[in-house]
Structures are given as structure tokens and as C-alpha cells.
């Protein structure tokens, strides 16, 4: 069986070495199709302005990395990442939670960003009140979609998603409270694990639960990839290109936010991101060929340019 068939993504065989960009494009196309249907369902309801803003937020592009991690993790453990599977439901719910977090993070009271993925942020395209309601609505839609099945594992996944979302909010609160203060390395790592790491970790663990009913020892993979992702994000904010990223760069430094690169330097931060990735790969090694996509995603987390 080709990898594409195993993933439920109909686009032919994947060449070796693993083409991660092609894999992400296929996952993104598949996820976008489902999100488009969810958004279309909302547009049949009132008020129309809120439904349009939800669609604008959901279909704003992006790598769809978190859904890809869910599906790859599920596949790594022999689960069904197909269109009728629980893994896809969780992947879509997780992406809706992630999207809500971006909409709220961009608000003037938070990060005050005008641009996201090369487009005006929701509060700029609409208004601040609508952006708040979009985030609120996406939270509800996420859990309604996930729980719209009789599968008993959905309850465990809903609890995982709720915990991840709560930790993300706690991380944002820590981040806001830390502006202008000098944090210790342990405090920075705690912030990173919550603000960004929580949903990355939930993606990996959620895929395992969808496949087997339990995390199956993938919690360390989720934690390590969450750490590596946030370090890479902080490095991109320091050294990335605004046009390529589709958003403002240098904002953390300008706001006086504590990041790992600001504490230990760019080179050491890169080394630690690579080390975290290597530790995740070591856990995945015994899973063999079924974990090929998940291993490729782990490497992508630290090598990405956007």
C-alpha cells in the first residue's frame, strides 16, 4: 500500500525520501475541504456577518500542521486517518481551537497584530467585537464537531482538547504578565510548554488515542515537538522574513518578551530545538515505516522557514 492510500489522501505514491511539503499540501487540501463545509453550514445560519467572519478565519490558509500531526500519529499506530475516522474529527476540532487562539491573539488587547498569513487579521477585516465572537464561536464549533459521533473515545479526546486549550490560555496569561520582566530559563520553558506546546502535544497524543484508545507512550513526542516548535517560532521571529511568514517579525523583541533565543542565544536555541527533535525521533524509531510521516513532520518542525 502506498503511503497516500494509508493516509486516506488520494494523490498517488509519495517518493522517497519523504516529501513533507507534498504531504502537508495534501493534508491541507483535505482539511480545508472539510472546514469549508463546516463554514458553509454556518453561513446558512444568522447572523450572516458572524458566519462570514468565521469562514474568513477558518479559510485563511496556514500549514495545517496540527491536523497533519494528528493524522500522522494515528497512522503511526495503525489507526484509520480516513474521512470517516475519529482522527479527522479531532484534527478539525483542534484546528478550530487553534484558529480561535490566533483570532484572539491578534486583538489589540493581546498581540495587536494587523496581518496574519498575508491578510488583514479578523479584527481588521471586520471589527474587534466580531473577532471576539468568532473565537468564542469556534470553540463551541470545535467541541460540537468532535462530539458529533457515537464513538466512546470522543469523550477522552474532548477532555484532551479542553486541557490543551486551557493550558494555551494559561500560557498566554503568563506571556502577558512577563512583558518587560526578566524571566528565568525555567519560567520561559514553562511558558513555552503551555502557550504553544500544549496544542502541538495534544495533536500527537490525540492521534494515538483515536487509533488505539490510549496515548501509547507518545506523550514525550508531543512534549518534545511542542518545545521544538516554539523555539523555531521564536527564531523565525528574530531571523525570519516578514513577506515569507505573512506576518510581522521582531515583535517579541520589541515588546520585551522573554524567549529562549533571547536567554541563551540563537545558536544554542537552534541546538536545543534540534536536540528536542532528536529525542522525539528516538521514541518513534521502533514504530518503523508506519511512522514515516510523523518522523518527517518532527524534522519539519525545526527546519521550516514559515
Q: Where are each of the predicted segments found?
A:
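Mg2+-dependent prenyl diphosphate-binding active-site environment of isoprenoid biosynthetic enzymes
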Residues: 44-282, 289-302
Amino acid at each position: 500500500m502506498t503511503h497516500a492510500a494509508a493516509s486516506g489522501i488520494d494523490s498517488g505514491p509519495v517518493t522517497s525520501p519523504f516529501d513533507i511539503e507534498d504531504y502537508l499540501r495534501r493534508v491541507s487540501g483535505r482539511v480545508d475541504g472539510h472546514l469549508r463545509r463546516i463554514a458553509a453550514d454556518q453561513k446558512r445560519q444568522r447572523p450572516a456577518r458572524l458566519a462570514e467572519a468565521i469562514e474568513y478565519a477558518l479559510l485563511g490558509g496556514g500549514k495545517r500542521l496540527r491536523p497533519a500531526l494528528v493524522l500522522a500519529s494515528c497512522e503511526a499506530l495503525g489507526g484509520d486517518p480516513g474521512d470517516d475516522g475519529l482522527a479527522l474529527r479531532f484534527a478539525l476540532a483542534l484546528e478550530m481551537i487553534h484558529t480561535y487562539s490566533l483570532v484572539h491573539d491578534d486583538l489589540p488587547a493581546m498581540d495587536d497584530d494587523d496581518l496574519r498569513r498575508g491578510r488583514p487579521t479578523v479584527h481588521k477585516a471586520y471589527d474587534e467585537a466580531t473577532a471576539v465572537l468568532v473565537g468564542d464561536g469556534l470553540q463551541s464549533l470545535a467541541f460540537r464537531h468532535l462530539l458529533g459521533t457515537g464513538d466512546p473515545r470522543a469523550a477522552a479526546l474532548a477532555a484532551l482538547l479542553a486541557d490543551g486549550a486551557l493550558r494555551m490560555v494559561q500560557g498566554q496569561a503568563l506571556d502577558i504578565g512577563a512583558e518587560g520582566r526578566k524571566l528565568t530559563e525555567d519560567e520561559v520553558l514553562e511558558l513555552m510548554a503551555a502557550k504553544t506546546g500544549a496544542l502541538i502535544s495534544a495533536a500527537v497524543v490525540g492521534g494515538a488515542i483515536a487509533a488505539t484508545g490510549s496515548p501509547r507512550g507518545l506523550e514525550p513526542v508531543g512534549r518534545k515537538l511542542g518545545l521544538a516548535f516554539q523555539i523555531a517560532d521564536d527564531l523565525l521571529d528574530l531571523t525570519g522574513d516578514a513577506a515569507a511568514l505573512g506576518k510581522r517579525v521582531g515583535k517579541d523583541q520589541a515588546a520585551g518578551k522573554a524567549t529562549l533565543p533571547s536567554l541563551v542565544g540563537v545558536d544554542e536555541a537552534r541546538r536545543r530545538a534540534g536536540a528536542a527533535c532528536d529525542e522525539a525521533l528516538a521514541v518513534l524509531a521502533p514504530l518503523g515505516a508506519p511512522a514515516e510521516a510523523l518522523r518527517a513532520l518532527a524534522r519539519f518542525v525545526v527546519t521550516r522557514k514559515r
